[in-house]
Amino acid sequence: MILLENVKKIYKAKSGDVTAVDNANLKIEKGEIFGVIGYSGAGKSSLIRLFNQLEKPTSGQITIANRVISAITGSELRKARQEIGMIFQHFNLLWSRTVRENIEFPLEIAGVDKAKRRKRVDELIHLVGLEGRGDAYPSQLSGGQKQRVGIARALANNPQVLLCDEATSALDPETTDQILDLLLDINKRLGLTIVLITHEMHVIRKICNRVAVMEKGKIVETGPVLDVFRNPKQDITKRFVQQLTDSEDTNETIESLIEKYPDGKVIRLQFIGEAVERPVLQRLMQRSDIEVSILQGNIAQTNNGSYGSLVVHLNGEETAIQQAIEGIHQDQVELEVIAHG
């Protein structure tokens, strides 16, 4: 569906060239929700603007739906852009137009007749949950409602791809989840390919099928979300995953408990998918003559399944502890020893 091949974007500056995107290679399948995560300055905003040619690549090739979009210009490019919707962090609405008029705007530009425009706007208002707000102005809307207008406007021309540029960064956590649920629903209903950029791992966890991690203009890691959670390879990816699996309070609690109970071993168990539902600790206590204390645990739901983490203190004879660890491995649960007694 979307293919980036050796794509590079270099900006000219007085201080010298700035490479915002450095030889990016990506393949995004039709109908998936693909996330790009990175800290500020990683190059993710420059990357997503290459998809619809708001920015032109310095080199490389971008193909969307079998069309090399990086090689077209003029009316052909304008037509191609109608198949690529985009929403923004700060909504970019026309403040002098009502909700209906904002949604209708791209249809006017495309030359759609008035009756068809009215029907399409009605469909979109219903789709994004803005019934009764069609005559309101942006200044009368909440942040979440403004973004719903932005989504409806982006979908007006029935695009194949929806680009989301930090679409939830300006929203509170509850509204963020509501917008993410809406995007997930739209993806399932319409089979729409969604590409989003964010600095929040929560966004990736909640709706993405796959993720690419960017750092200093480079894509340093790519994979299914669950695989990245289970086995992050790069240091930056590990930091993002720890946003969800750890916290400073949790780490301080574990450290204090390790000091309080210096004997035995402290282990971290990671559960992926169906493994979350296995009675691992129950089996452990049934077959081992050791004491088992749970220090910390959490479960996160991703778009591909569940991910769980459990920190446990094992106390007893060294041989019994080792046998218990081997038994956990047999249950196909990933294990890391984080403290030795």
From Swiss-Prot:
Enzyme Commission number: 7.4.2.11
Membrane topology reported for the UniProt record: Peripheral membrane protein
Assigned GO CC terms: plasma membrane
Pfam families attached to this UniProt entry: ABC_tran, NIL
EC category name: translocase
Keywords (A to Z) from UniProt: Amino-acid transport, ATP-binding, Cell membrane, Membrane, Nucleotide-binding, Translocase, Transport
Segments forming a coiled coil: none
Domain ABC transporter: 2-241
Residues reported to bind ATP: 38-45
Family annotation (PROSITE patterns): ABC_TRANSPORTER_1, ABC_TRANSPORTER_2, METN
Stored InterPro entries: AAA+_ATPase (IPR003593), ABC_transporter-like_ATP-bd (IPR003439), ABC_transporter-like_CS (IPR017871), ACT-like_dom_sf (IPR045865), MetN_ABC (IPR041701), MetN_ABC_transporter-like (IPR050086), NIL_domain (IPR018449), P-loop_NTPase (IPR027417)
Reaction(s) catalysed (UniProt annotation): L-methionine(out) + ATP + H2O = L-methionine(in) + ADP + phosphate + H(+); D-methionine(out) + ATP + H2O = D-methionine(in) + ADP + phosphate + H(+)
Location relative to the cell: Cell membrane
Subunit comment: The complex is composed of two ATP-binding proteins (MetN), two transmembrane proteins (MetI) and a solute-binding protein (MetQ).
Function per UniProt: Part of the ABC transporter complex MetNIQ involved in methionine import. Responsible for energy coupling to the transport system.
PANTHER family: AMINO ACID IMPORT ATP-BINDING PROTEIN, METHIONINE IMPORT ATP-BINDING PROTEIN METN 2
Record's protein name: Methionine import ATP-binding protein MetN 3
Organism: Bacillus cereus (strain ATCC 14579 / DSM 31 / CCUG 7414 / JCM 2152 / NBRC 15305 / NCIMB 9373 / NCTC 2599 / NRRL B-3711)
